Amino acid sequence: MKTLAVVDSSGWLEYFTGSSRAQFFAQAIEETENLVVPIITIYEVFKKVHRERGESAALQVASSMQGGTVVDLDLSIALDAARLQLPLADSIIYTTAPRHGAVLWTQDDHFKGLPSVRYFPIPSTSP
């Protein structure tokens, strides 16, 4: 049995823009039978794509994200997420992953060192 995956919003954005970092998230995103998608992730990605590329592109992205199992925010996740010292969306995304037996794939420093996280650090760009 494969491990389930939750991909953080930044990973989805790397994937959809085809950046050089998309490779880190492609496997988790493309194996939709093992993909858990917190609804707040769709919100964050839709909002950014809508702002930068318009309604049509944002709707296509949101549709694509629904290939995995979309998970709504419930009271239990909300309360557990509120106990974390993370920003709102990050705490909900992080709490959703273990709740569904998934590993969180991310490049966000907020999650570095936390259990059940597959962290892909962004190389520093020193002058």
Which residue ranges define each predicted feature?
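Acidic, PIN/NYN-like endoribonuclease modules and their adjacent C-terminal/linker elements
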Residues: K2, G67-G68, Y94, P98-P127
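A generic structural signal for short hydrophobic patches within well-formed alpha-helices
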Residues: W12-L13, I42, A78, F111-K112
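Acidic catalytic patch
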Residues: T41-E44, S64-L84
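Histidine- and aromatic-rich ligand-binding microenvironments
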Residues: V7-D8, V37-P38, L86-D90, D108, ...
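Active-site phosphate/pyrophosphate-handling residues
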Residues: S10, S76, S91-T95
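Short, well-structured N-terminal submotif of metal-dependent ribonuclease cores
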Residues: M1-V37, V49-A62, T125-P127
